Amino acid sequence: MEDHVLKKLNANGPAPHIPNLNLYGKKMNFSYMVMTLLGRNLQDLESTNFVVNKGFSRGTWSRVGIQWVYALKYVHYNGFIHRNVNTQNLFLGNEKDSERAKIIHILDFGLGRPFARYHARENKWIVRIARHSAEFRGSFRYASPNVHLRKEQGRVDDVWSLPYVIIELNGGKALPWQTDYRRGRVEQMKLNLTPKDVMSDMPACMDKLMPHLASLNYYQRPDDHMIFKCFWQVMENEKITPSSKFDWENEEPDMSVPPAAWENPDGRYFQSNPLEINGPPTPAEVDFVL
């Protein structure tokens, strides 16, 4: 699945926040892939000595969040869901790669799944019908409540991992279930704790994030633009710009690096909806996705 998804995501050339797939194949009993050389993942950066008291400042995690939403949006708009987003699967570009060094890349599509298919004859994307139940896929620390309930995962469930990770990165704070490795106990906390309980140490502008996600079903599209604006508000409150140093950086920002698409303060990219999917397939469309 990994090479299949990366091939699709790179079909139109180098993609933002996605490593290039340069070579892949199978020889004897071994499968191989050659892709863009990246840097450290967020888990490594969080625990490194570069970061004081662990965790990240609000100015850093707000920009990480925006780039993460951008990466997920690109994956979703190519008809896939990731199903295992966590700090181990989000990588910075290699520090010697000036174009990618400050960019968050999403990786590890081994649990990925197409949730929609493009039909050339109809010239439209058609969503797959949700299964009545689905196996648990992902990390139980960051998985959405829907995953614990064995519901079909959609775009919203990828985004559910976002607040959980950001809470963990927020100055080294802990999730309520941070040190609990009992799946049943983690499940009960996720299902019973209110968003206010979970987000108690977060900026007020983030309060709407979890209630919004809780209101969506498998077919509905998360409001990427609203989520973007939440993170952008945190940036503004912290007097941070996209060019500011991340917590792990020592050198001054390189102002010659071209701005990324997400740096537009209006968030125009996040307002687009090329799949035009926000509900279940019509009876006429069902035959195309079965």
UniProtKB/Swiss-Prot annotation:
Gene Ontology BP annotations: signal transduction
Single GO molecular function: protein serine/threonine kinase activity
Record Gene3D superfamilies: Transferase(Phosphotransferase) domain 1 (1.10.510.10)
SMART domains linked: S_TKc (SM00220)
Domain spans labelled Protein kinase: 1-240
Top-rank taxon: Eukaryota
A GO CC term assigned to this protein in UniProt: nucleus
UniProt-listed PANTHER family: CASEIN KINASE-RELATED (PTHR11909)
Family note: Belongs to the protein kinase superfamily. CK1 Ser/Thr protein kinase family.
Recorded domain comment: The protein kinase domain is predicted to be catalytically inactive.
Identification of the protein by name: Inactive tau-tubulin kinase ttbk-6
Taxonomic source organism: Caenorhabditis elegans
